[in-house]
Amino acid sequence: MHAWPAPKIPSLPGRNRLPSLFDTASRRLVTVGSQQGASMYVCGITPYDATHLGHAATYVAFDLLVRTWHDAGVTVRYAQNVTDVDDPLLERARQVDQPWEAIAARETAKFRADMAALRVVPPDRYVGVVESLPQIIGLIEVLRSRGLTYELDGDQYFATHAIPDFGAVSHLGRDDMIALFAARGGDPDRAGKKDPLDALLWRGKRPEEPSWPAPFGRGRPGWHVECAAIALTHLPLPLDVQGGGADLVFPHHDMTAAQAEAATGRRFARAYVHTGLVAYQGEKMSKSLGNLVFVSDLCAAGADPMAVRLALLDHHYRTEWEWTPRLLDEATDRLAEWRAAVRRPRGAPGDGLLAAVRDRLADDLDAPGAIALIDEWTTQDGDDPDAPTLVAAMADALLGVHL
């Protein structure tokens, strides 16, 4: 599977330091990456409705991290998956009476176009679940060989209950885990399971569902093992960052880590980084609720993609916030002011601004702080003929906002 075209990133004088981000597992700021390189896996879309602003906020946030690493002189290895076969996709296919493969291809193409419009740097490994079935089946076989799976009515389950430190990412109590597992695609109440938190690895063949051959019977993979297998295939362990939205902390990231670590005996990730959820009309923006605002719809209605990106960046990646049309209006005005300022023949000196913007981004990706600094620069007078060009380059290279 291919990603989208990479935007051209301007070069800047000097370098930033390595960024520090909030690690959900340790509940503190940690330095991520090193001068020897950085690796990141970000959970991708299930392509049946893409790309809403909740998606966009997540991928723009991790794009900010990629750009900050690049600015620190770090070589980045970045993988992202596409869950191109899954229960919600199959349900959508039944609802609209279309092949699930066609829906997945169409929505993935739309996602690629949206990411390109938002100037998101693509992952160097953009990988679908279907194309990764050999690796997923191989990982399940490793877990089977270690006695960490069991069969139930043709399905294969991971013995989560056998992992002593399970829950090290979320730190949730057992009752909260079971409740969230039920709410987020799990089956804690299924009769015959050895433990409510045991996770489905392989769903045996069902009528009118796609299936593939495996040593343990035809079927299709469960959610968590997909990401574990793709990450293990394309990135070295431990990952520097496992990323995604806050709704993936549990069960997805706890279970992905448990399965990967059980198979390899190695730590899965040094840091787990999560973005806050975006609301609309008083509720979390989600496909199940249907309260979605799509990037493509905003752009089709005349919004500049750079204004959409600015609106997203004006909220710290870890905060929860609510989308309103006013935010796009404000971002459109800000974009116009920035563009006017960098087209002036002279401006206030930009060297100090560059250092300050870099400092904000290295400190837990403080994009709102960086934006405020550029706002302040646009109001200042100066006679530096190189400043407007430098500020335009830093906005593009560091924030991804092309002026």
UniProtKB/Swiss-Prot annotation:
One of its GO terms (cellular component) is cytosol. GO terms for biological process: cysteinyl-tRNA aminoacylation; mycothiol biosynthetic process. Keywords: ATP-binding, Ligase, Metal-binding, Nucleotide-binding, Zinc. InterPro entries: Cys-tRNA/MSH_ligase, Mycothiol_ligase_MshC, Rossmann-like_a/b/a_fold, tRNA-synt_1_cat_dom. Zn(2+) binds at residues 43, 227, 252. Its EC number is 6.3.1.13. HAMAP family: MshC (MF_01697). Belongs to the class-I aminoacyl-tRNA synthetase family. MshC subfamily. This is L-cysteine:1D-myo-inositol 2-amino-2-deoxy-alpha-D-glucopyranoside ligase.
